[in-house]
Amino acid sequence: MQKKTPDYDNVFKTMKMKHKRLFVPVINDVFDRNYPKDVKVDILSSEGYLTETETADGSKDIEEQISDFLIKIENEIYLLECQSYDDGSMAIRIAEYAFIVARQFASWDIGHATIPMPRFSIIYVKRTERTPKATMITFTFPDGQTVDYKSDNVILEDFTKEKVVEKRLFPYIPFYIAKYEKEIASEGNIENVIEELVYFREEMIRLHQAGELSDDELIDLKGFVNTIITHITNGNKNEERLVNIMGGTVIETESDKIKIRTIIEMGQEVGLEDSEILKKLQEKIIGLPLTRAKAYLEQYGKQLV
């Protein structure tokens, strides 16, 4: 079973809610569209469904599956899924998501219904020997008719850092270093990682100065990068060095500090271990490195009676 990567999901979902306009160039690139940057983007409710899966001990577990990113631009519906690994279930999950979406926008009358299927694509953060180039769902009907519902997948390893910036594919930047996961996690040679992080930092600053990225977008993108770094390093010696490239932690506002203190106080009140509190801090505060989380725990935890 592939390991779950909630940090990747959290970054993707936080980005879509806070900075949906950054996804317009992604939609243009993936689906060969030409929407202007200021086009209206509607985030649609990601209605979930329940599915039964088998756990390691053979028992059954019920999980709710919710699509990553469902948006409407003009009259088109787009479904994007961010995936770190292909676990063999993506095609059927896309089919299930697509039918849920189609039902919301279906039209019908006596004896007839029209069910519009959304355009979809899967964004693979990492490439393995099992990563497919495309996803295809084949519908078969009793009369022998078959219809293929197909889309090319996005594999981030196929993009150069220059292409990401040239096409303004900002949502890809936080996940770009995932291809170096082995080197980063094993404390191997990370010079290539450093070079690419410096490149992205300088380009984001340049585009911010040119007015293409807002203050919040720049700060959050750097924070998202640091979240992925801390996920991969898991506190090893590479963490501080890599996080500092993006300018260290982005937690500077009083509201963020109040939120951090609240998480620590509530965690200690219910008897959570320090490791659990640290995990919650990094889940709730995008871009907070483990070293800073520990410092906040020491600072605010000492004040409790």
Model-assigned labels for residue ranges:
Residues 165-195:
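Coupling/switch segment of ABC-type P-loop NTPase heads
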Residues 8-15, 156-161, 178-188, 202-213:
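Charged, low-complexity surface segments at secondary-structure and domain boundaries
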Residues 2, 72-84, 184-305:
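Short, charged alpha-helical interaction segments and adjacent helix-coil junctions
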Residues 19-22, 180, 238, 300:
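Residue-level recognition of alpha-helix termini/interfacial anchor residues
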Residues 10, 90, 176, 198, ...:
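Short alpha-helical segments used as structural interaction elements across diverse proteins
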Residues 1-171, 305:
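Accessory alpha/beta interaction modules
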Residues 98, 102-105, 181, 229-233:
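Short amphipathic alpha-helical signal-transduction/dimerization elements
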